[in-house]
């Protein structure tokens, strides 16, 4: 769903930042 998509994006950003 859309929430899962947001979670995926947030996770990707977190991986890039860290």
From Swiss-Prot:
Coiled coil start-end: none
Organism classification: Eukaryota, Metazoa, Chordata, Craniata, Vertebrata
Subcellular compartments: Secreted
Highest taxon of the lineage: Eukaryota
Presence of keyword Secreted: yes
Tissue-specificity statement: Expressed by the skin dorsal glands.
One of the protein's GO biological processes: defense response to bacterium
Ranges annotated as spanning the membrane: none
Name the UniProt record assigns to this protein: Maculatin-2.1
Record key words, sorted: Amidation, Amphibian defense peptide, Antibiotic, Antimicrobial, Secreted
GO CC field: extracellular region
Threonine amide modified-residue sites: 18
Record function comment: Shows antibacterial activity against B.cereus, L.innocua, M.luteus, S.aureus, S.epidermidis and S.uberis.
């Amino acid at each position: 769903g859309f929430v899962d998509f947001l979670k995926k994006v947030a996770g990707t950003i977190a991986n890039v930042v860290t």
